[in-house]
């Protein structure tokens, strides 16, 4: 049985893709063994992220570390997948000639054939094309062991924000046909999955073709998935404010399975910076979306992405972001220092903000967000939360770990038969990034 080591960088879409790489290899070889140490593997894969420079350079650092393994085991296959593969292509082979296969997010289904071609010809294989929907037509049926699962409903992005490489590495937006998505979710539900997370770079741009040739939008998809037997909870990641329509907002009013948690990236609170980023909305328009959502779901927890130190960002513009964060009361969020990416329009902008100042802004924004997260955690003490039990606690092997609808980890004392089940937990203690709870007796 082939032994496979895979390291995944970046977003949840990459996590989904990594699972699919393992699936296509398992189908090809009649099963595989996933190992946690690279030196045990017959196949080593790096599923990469190019959103930030540090993530990209870490890939080449990791490749350097596995190079000696290739010298010891000439038959070892080393592969680079994901967005760095799409961006760099043949340059990866030039920089690291011991790499055997390089493939992008849309060609991962071709991995088994690429490995065969490498072994037959002795030549490194590169395929970073964008065949769109073909990938999903060639993936084996989803198999899961947990109570939650990702389902990719669309890929790519056509927004072309000035700082972002996604349209260049994952291609333009394309949606899976509605029936394909529903079949996968129904199959997962039959395997015991309770929670579905619909994935895409911009899920609210979903336009899936139906059997009659009509187009299904994202709000309609949510309503259909809501009625699939066995699915008890729904999430989606990630959405774009520009297409967050009233019909999607109304889903929060009508669909109780849709969790009271939303990740909606704003990036900045400054209209000038948002314009320079080519985001396509203003801070006021973003606030309007949130106001409508919270009128329907007062308990909605909102997370976001922020970039500090975007070229030309002034102190006043940063203060506008800080004020927006306080006004909206963002929950757990991701704050990054701007990282110029080759080939994007923003990479050509003049940047005169010292790195030390960018770090200060990063820390100041994180401080405000973490304080709000801690406040929300405290308000949950004494409440009863419906939770999905994920497995053994990462903090204490004698405890279990569950997740609330608003994306909190709850550690509690339970029994193994509770894993992958939905249970009610009373929150007894709150910490910075987790909660403690106890089972509510029936």
Swiss-Prot record:
SUPFAM superfamilies: Radical SAM enzymes. Its cofactor is [4Fe-4S] cluster. One of its GO terms (cellular component) is cytosol. InterPro entries: Elp3/MiaA/NifB-like_rSAM, Methylthiotransferase, Methylthiotransferase_CS, Methylthiotransferase_N, Methylthiotransferase_N_sf, MiaB_methiolase, rSAM, rSAM_horseshoe. Residues 2-120 form the MTTase N-terminal domain. Keywords: 4Fe-4S, Cytoplasm, Iron, Iron-sulfur, Metal-binding, S-adenosyl-L-methionine, Transferase, tRNA processing. GO terms for molecular function: 4 iron, 4 sulfur cluster binding; metal ion binding; N6-isopentenyladenosine methylthiotransferase activity. Belongs to the methylthiotransferase family. MiaB subfamily. Catalyzes the methylthiolation of N6-(dimethylallyl)adenosine (i(6)A), leading to the formation of 2-methylthio-N6-(dimethylallyl)adenosine (ms(2)i(6)A) at position 37 in tRNAs that read codons beginning with uridine. Binds 2 [4Fe-4S] clusters. One cluster is coordinated with 3 cysteines and an exchangeable S-adenosyl-L-methionine. It is found in: Cytoplasm. The lineage of its organism: Bacteria, Pseudomonadati, Pseudomonadota, Betaproteobacteria, Neisseriales. This is tRNA-2-methylthio-N(6)-dimethylallyladenosine synthase. The keyword Phosphoprotein does not apply. Its main location: cytoplasm. Its EC number is 2.8.4.3. Residues 143-375 form the Radical SAM core domain. Gene3D superfamilies: Methylthiotransferase, N-terminal domain, tm_1862 like domain. CDD domains: Radical_SAM. It comes from the Bacteria. [4Fe-4S] cluster 1 binds at residues 11, 49, 83. [4Fe-4S] cluster 2 binds at residues 157, 161, 164.
């Amino acid at each position: 049985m082939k032994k496979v080591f895979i390291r995944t960088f970046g977003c949840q879409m990459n996590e989904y893709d990594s699972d699919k790489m393992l699936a296509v290899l398992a189908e090809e070889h009649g099963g595989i063994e996933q190992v946690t140490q690279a030196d045990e593997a017959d196949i080593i894969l790096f599923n990469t992220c190019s959103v930030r420079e540090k993530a990209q350079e870490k890939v080449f650092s990791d490749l350097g570390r596995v190079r000696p393994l290739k010298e010891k085991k000439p038959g070892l296959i080393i592969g680079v997948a994901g967005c760095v593969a799409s961006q760099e292509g043949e340059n990866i082979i030039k920089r690291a000639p011991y790499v055997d296969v390089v493939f992008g997010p849309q060609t991962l289904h071709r991995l088994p054939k690429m490995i065969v071609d490498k072994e037959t010809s002795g030549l490194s294989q590169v395929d970073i094309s964008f065949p769109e929907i073909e990938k999903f037509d060639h993936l084996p049926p989803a198999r899961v062991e947990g109570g939650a699962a990702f389902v990719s409903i669309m890929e790519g992005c056509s927004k072309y924000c000035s700082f972002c490489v996604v349209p260049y590495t994952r291609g333009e937006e394309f949606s899976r046909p509605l029936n394909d998505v529903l079949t996968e979710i129904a199959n997962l539900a039959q395997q015991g999955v309770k929670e579905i997370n619909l994935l895409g770079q911009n899920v609210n741009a979903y336009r899936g073709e139906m059997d009659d040739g009509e187009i299904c939008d994202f709000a309609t998809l949510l309503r259909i998935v809501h009625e699939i037997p066995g699915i008890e909870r729904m999430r989606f990641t990630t959405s774009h404010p520009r297409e967050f329509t009233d019909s999607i907002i109304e889903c929060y009013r009508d669909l109780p399975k849709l969790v009271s948690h939303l990740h909606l990236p704003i990036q900045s609170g400054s209209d000038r910076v948002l314009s320079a980023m080519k985001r396509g909305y203003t801070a006021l328009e973003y606030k309007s979306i949130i106001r409508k959502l919270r009128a329907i779901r007062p308990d909605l927890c909102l997370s976001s992405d922020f970039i500090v130190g975007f070229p030309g960002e002034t102190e006043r513009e940063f203060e506008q972001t800080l004020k927006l964060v306080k006004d909206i009361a963002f929950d757990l969020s991701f704050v990054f220092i701007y990282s110029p990416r080759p080939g994007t329009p923003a990479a050509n902008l003049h940047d005169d903000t010292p790195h030390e100042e960018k770090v200060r802004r990063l820390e100041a924004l994180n401080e405000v967000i973490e304080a709000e997260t801690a406040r929300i955690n405290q308000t949950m003490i004494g409440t009863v939360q419906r939770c999905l039990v994920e497995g053994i606690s990462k903090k204490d092997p004698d405890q279990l770990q569950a997740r609330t609808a608003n994306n909190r980890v709850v550690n509690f004392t339970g029994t193994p038969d509770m894993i992958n089940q939905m249970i009610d937990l009373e929150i007894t203690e709150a910490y910075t990034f987790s909660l403690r709870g106890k089972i509510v007796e029936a």
